Amino acid sequence: MKIISRLNKKNKNVYGDNTDYIGFAKIYKKLVKKNVNKILLIGAGGAARSILQFLNDEKIKQVDIFTRTLNKKKILSRTMKFDNFYIDSKEIRNKHYDLIINASDAGMLGRKNLASNIYKLVPNTSFIIDIVYNPLRTNLIETARANNVPNDGG
């Protein structure tokens, strides 16, 4: 996968592994109880790349990636070679997604919230996953709960 999120030292050697992929896979398999075809992934950093790899391994048909950072968008499109991904930083293509994933720092304590157009999508979404861990109940999770949309995160 070529993405490391944790380093371990053993017998004077350093090993890297990826907890983002494993952690997301557990949440996804616990929460998502039906096939999903259209996913909105918010973010384009290291965690988002791990999640993209998982989604590709699961053979998801369509993933729209929404990112505010043009440089990360360029890096992501250059390093992740999948044909079912659409990347934009200005608009969201669909009004309905089976799953919305926040893999950005938006909503994290001390950071900006997600763009308001994201929250408007929640009532028409089947599942929400927000990987932000502080606070555990982000505005996205609270919006999902208020609309009775199954959700998980952290």
Model-derived regions: residue spans:
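A general structural signal for well-ordered alpha-helical segments in protein cores
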Residues: 1-4, 21, 48, 73, ...
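Phosphate/diphosphate ligand-binding glycine-rich loop within oxidoreductases
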Residues: 1-31
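Glycine-rich adenosine-cofactor-binding loop
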Residues: 28, 36-57, 67
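Short, conserved loop/helix-junction motifs that constitute active-site signature segments
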Residues: 33-35, 57-59, 117-125
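Conserved S-adenosyl-L-methionine
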Residues: 57-62, 146-150
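NAD(P)-binding Rossmann-fold cofactor-contacting core
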Residues: 60-80
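Rossmann-like adenosine-cofactor binding region
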Residues: 83-153
